[in-house]
Amino acid sequence: MAMTITEKILAEHAGLDKVVPGQLITAQLDLALANDITGPVSIREFEKFGVETVWDKTKVALVPDHFTPNKDIASAELSKALREFAKKQGIVHYWEQGRVGVEHCLLPEQGVTLPGDVIIGADSHTCTYGALGAFATGVGSTDLAAGMATGEAWFRIPESIKFIFKGTNFQPWVSGKDLILYTIGKIGVDGARYRSMEFTGEGIAALSMDGRLTMCNMAVEAGAKNGIIPPDEKTLAYVNERAKRPYKVYHSDPDAQYVEVYEWDVADIPLQVAFPHLPENAKPVSEGKGIKIDQVVIGSCTNGRLEDMQVAAQILKGQKVHGDVRLIVIPGTQDIYKQAMQEGLIDIFIDAGAVVSTPTCGPCLGGYMGILAKGERALSTTNRNFVGRMGHPESEVYLSGPAVAAASAVTGEISHPEEVL
């Protein structure tokens, strides 16, 4: 029986020869992930089970990234709970401040997430790891606690939607962020509800791994159970530099069944900006012309990778941030930060008048390191622009890729990069 890549991964981890959409299964996990917001809740639930130890200390990852460094007593207590549990349990994949990064940038970089894995995380953007050819999805803290205790999780097999991006003739500065914003704009924030979004085509093959990670990161913004990109030579080259354990590559059968198939030519996709207050409000950047902004954020689990830093620096080199704009740049991990320093990118940001932060999720969730006041407007490379997402309920958040964000920081309004180059 023909199956999609998602169905094949779940079938094997459930010990089954085949599965069909709608079927309930129990699957073996390769990784259970939590952060400093969700982890303490999972730990409390775990301790209620009466279980002494996690099922496998090499398959649990605890990442204190949302409030790093701690912003107040409450966040310090959350980090302390994670730290003490990691030490007590001997958790291998725990990163302390100074080594930690934004979880969905850090784990692929460190070779913790690999093709063919089944991964659950108490964070909705766990779907990022689908870019490696893994089944990865967000769960609640209670399900995560059960996963830490048993090494298993239950799933309903999702239907799959196939997205084919034809051609490689990208418009200037268009990236994976623009492809995924365009996609969400076409199908809506519930257009893939509890479905697997499978991204294929020449356009996807042409993307870097950083661009692919960005795309899968935002699958959940269309309501998807997971996003996934079948591995190719580019994937394997990336993984083989990092992997410390065996992995298995899966691909969809040619005659696998999809509930919907979308097909677009990348040449027809311009730079995108998602207007408030939903990611589905994606429009060409030209429609944002004249919209003034108070703050720009370049970073996050969506666009905090090295390629994003490089793109932003290309535009900011020799430029100055507009006098009415605050520009905050946040490399996703310490390694990305270090590489950006070695390439001279950090100097470019600072010379332009940007704040460069240690890796943190901070402003994305309205936590700290860039909160918006009443009436303020931000352009951000993050993944959500809900009401009050980055601060005051009467603030506004627009979403874009790093090229548009950097250009807009210079002009003081939403702008195409060509306006400053």
From Swiss-Prot:
Associated pathway: Amino-acid biosynthesis; L-leucine biosynthesis; L-leucine from 3-methyl-2-oxobutanoate: step 2/4
Cofactor comment: Binds 1 [4Fe-4S] cluster per subunit.
Record-listed E.C. numbers: 4.2.1.33
Protein keywords: 4Fe-4S, Amino-acid biosynthesis, Branched-chain amino acid biosynthesis, Iron, Iron-sulfur, Leucine biosynthesis, Lyase, Metal-binding
Sites where the protein binds [4Fe-4S] cluster: C301, C361, C364
Reactions it catalyzes: (2R,3S)-3-isopropylmalate = (2S)-2-isopropylmalate
InterPro entries noted in UniProt: Acnase/IPM_dHydase_lsu_aba_1/3 (IPR015931), Acoase/IPM_deHydtase_lsu_aba (IPR001030), Aconitase_4Fe-4S_BS (IPR018136), Aconitase_4Fe-4S_dom (IPR036008), HAcnase/IPMdehydase_lsu_prok (IPR011826), Homoacnase/IPMdehydase_lsu (IPR006251), IPM_dehydratase_rel_enz (IPR050067), IPMI_cat (IPR033941)
The keyword Iron-sulfur is annotated on this UniProt entry: yes
GO biological process: L-leucine biosynthetic process
Reported cofactor(s): [4Fe-4S] cluster
Any single Pfam family the record assigns to this protein: Aconitase
CDD domains registered for this protein in UniProt: IPMI
Gene Ontology molecular function: 3-isopropylmalate dehydratase activity; 4 iron, 4 sulfur cluster binding; metal ion binding
Summary of the function given for this chain in its UniProt record: Catalyzes the isomerization between 2-isopropylmalate and 3-isopropylmalate, via the formation of 2-isopropylmaleate.
Family indicated by similarity: Belongs to the aconitase/IPM isomerase family. LeuC type 2 subfamily.
Assembly and oligomerization: Heterodimer of LeuC and LeuD.
NCBIfam families the record matches: hacA_fam (TIGR01343), IPMI_arch (TIGR02086), LEU2 (TIGR02083), PRK00402.1 (NF001614)
UniProt-recorded name of the protein: 3-isopropylmalate dehydratase large subunit
Gene behind the chain: leuC
